[in-house]
Amino acid sequence: VEFLDQLSLDETRAATQLIRERLAGQDIKFNYLTLREPLKAEYLAFRQGEGPRPDQRAFAILIDRRTPGGVIEAVINLTSHIIEEWKRVEDVMPILTPTDLGFIERVAQSDPQVIQACRDIGIYDMSQVYFNAWAIRFNEH
């Protein structure tokens, strides 16, 4: 079923264009853009011939570079070409991207304490050391 397929290139372009139009002149970074699946009730009604075809939607996570921790979530209706939901989300971190992970690995590989810890266990070639970043929530306990 088409509306359960991932976004096409044209749909991706349409979603990003709507977001850019809304944010004209603001310093925003796209963190994540994907298909927003229809609600199960909408899907079942359509499959059973009891409801209309669900609209195609995209879900986006955006980073507002001007605001520390500024994360925005948006739902874009690609059928009607409107942004249906737009909300700032507090106390969250955006999804780690491959760019973020590469940066973390470069920083860790060049950190003197990490280098020494590796040498202490017999590892001298830091290009052979890999790091896996995890997004862990801060816990005050």
Predicted regions and their residues:
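N- and C-terminal low-complexity/disordered segments
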Residues: 1-7, 49-55, 64, 77-80, ...
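A domain-level signal for the mature, folded cores of soluble proteins
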Residues: 1-34, 44, 100-110, 114-121
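Exposed beta-strand-loop-beta-strand "reactive/processing" segments of non-cytosolic proteins
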Residues: 25-78, 125-141
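Extended, regular secondary-structure scaffolds
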Residues: 80, 89-141
